[in-house]
Design a protein with these regions (language model features):
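C-terminal segment of classical bacterial N-terminal signal peptides
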Residues: 17-27
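Compositionally biased, intrinsically disordered/low-complexity regions enriched for serine, proline
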Residues: 1-2, 30
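Bacterial N-terminal signal peptides that target proteins for export
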Residues: 2-14, 21
């Protein structure tokens, strides 16, 4: 019986070991967050490094942010980068929360949905116009986005509001920073601005 040369056996063994190491490193990179865990700063980043789900959300946000950056290349002023730095600071402040993990997860999901909607990175439905208070010129234009959680962008004149779907006993209710949109059977109750009264709006 003839056996392969010793050098061939040695080379094959080294190659198999190298490929195995590459798989291990590749898997580790795929499972970890987008940032270097060796340089993790603070308890929140350390938690992300040790949590597969949070690491996956971090990688997803990095991908979504990169795609948004391409869309925002002509944005003036260039606010996206500044906003992202502020978001990271806010995420890291989740250590102050009663439930830091829940706070961190929520921050990721809302930020991902926000960027996907604002920069039109996911399928959308609309726009739809709603006339409010029986005044044809008082119109709210709404576009819905297939994000998680679902979002909409409402426009009224030169003002824009991003809103997230909220639990509701009937209809679809979305809430933004100071605005809300509650639709039921083609009619909507809209609040636009802090402390302002409800507007009754009909779909155009």
């Amino acid at each position: 019986m003839r056996y392969p040369p010793f050098k061939t056996i040695l080379f094959s063994s080294v190659l198999i070991m190298a490929l195995g190491c590459c798989r291990i490193v590749g898997t580790a990179m795929a499972e970890g967050p987008s940032f270097d865990c060796g340089k993790a700063s603070g308890s929140i980043e350390e938690m992300i490094c040790n949590d597969d789900e949070l690491s996956a959300l971090d990688r997803k946000l990095t991908d979504v942010y990169a795609r948004a950056t391409i869309k925002a290349i002509n944005e003036h002023p260039p606010v996206l980068k500044v906003e992202q730095r502020g978001w990271i600071k806010g995420r890291n402040d989740c250590w102050k929360s009663k439930d830091p993990r829940s706070c961190t997860e929520s921050n990721y999901r809302l930020r991902i949905a926000e960027l996907q909607a604002r920069y039109r990175l996911v399928p959308e439905n609309g726009p739809f116009g709603y006339f409010c208070n029986d005044k044809p010129r008082d119109e709210v234009v709404v576009t819905f986005f297939q994000t998680d959680p679902p979002t909409l962008i409402a426009e009224r004149g030169d003002q824009v509001s991003l809103m997230y779907l909220q639990p509701s006993s009937s209809g679809s209710k979305y809430q933004g920073r100071n605005e809300s949109f509650w639709e039921h059977h083609g009619e909507a109750i809209v609040v636009w601005g802090y402390g302002n009264p409800e507007m009754r709006c009909r779909k155009r």
